[in-house]
């Protein structure tokens, strides 16, 4: 079974995918590992679309049961028909931005306060992420995700990001089991 978990940055897609991987035979692939070159600090340089698609497809096809976390809206139309289940996590903006700020502090530590380049990069990322619910925003947004869901050729399960991880995991595993037995 092929599953996608997507939502805004900080909504919990990677956390949920890792938890499902821990409790099943699913292999977790995170789109950030294919989207960004390995740099220090991280998330500085994008991998070209054709290259990232090639590597993700190769890994995706290796496994019978795979769960991908991350937004794939801009990865190409072929990804719209490849999943058996898509899970959309929505979390209110205030909570999501709090999580992202905490993640930035954990990722960069003191450098977040002392390194001007990291400060600029982090601020730009947080400003970008804060636009998610703006209907006029041209980047990754709730509006774009809602429209993209309509184009997916699979069931879409919507999950409230405020649910505790255990409950989200149980909800997804129940859905996967129901699909596997039907």
What are these regions (language model features)?
Residues 5:
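Hydrophobic anchor at the beta1->P-loop junction of P-loop NTPases
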Residues 8:
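P-loop (Walker A) phosphate-binding loop of NTP-binding proteins
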Residues 11:
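ATP-binding Walker
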Residues 14:
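Walker A/P-loop
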Residues 18, 22-61:
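Conserved substrate/cofactor phosphate-moiety recognition/catalytic segment
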Residues 49-94:
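Glycine-rich phosphate-binding loop used to anchor ATP phosphates in small-molecule kinases
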Residues 90-140:
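A glycine- and Lys/Arg-enriched "phosphate-lid" helix/loop adjacent to the NTP-binding pocket
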Residues 127-182:
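NTP-dependent small-molecule kinase module
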């Amino acid at each position: 079974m092929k599953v996608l978990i997507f939502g805004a940055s900080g909504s919990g897609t990677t956390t949920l995918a890792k938890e499902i991987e821990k409790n099943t035979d699913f292999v977790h692939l995170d789109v950030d590992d294919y989207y960004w070159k390995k740099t220090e600090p991280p998330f500085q340089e994008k991998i070209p679309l054709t290259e990232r698609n090639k590597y993700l497809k190769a890994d995706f096809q290796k496994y019978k049961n795979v769960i991908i976390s991350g937004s794939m809206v801009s990865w190409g139309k072929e990804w719209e028909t490849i999943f058996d289940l898509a899970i959309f996590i929505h979390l209110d903006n205030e909570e999501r931005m709090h999580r992202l700020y905490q993640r930035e502090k954990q990722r960069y530590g003191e450098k977040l306060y002392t390194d001007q380049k990291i400060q600029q990069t982090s601020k730009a990322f947080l400003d970008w992420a804060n636009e998610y619910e703006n209907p006029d925003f041209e980047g990754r947004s709730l509006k774009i995700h809602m429209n993209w869901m309509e184009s997916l050729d699979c069931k879409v399960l919507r999950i409230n990001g405020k649910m505790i991880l255990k409950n989200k995991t149980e909800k997804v595993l129940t859905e996967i089991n129901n699909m596997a037995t039907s």
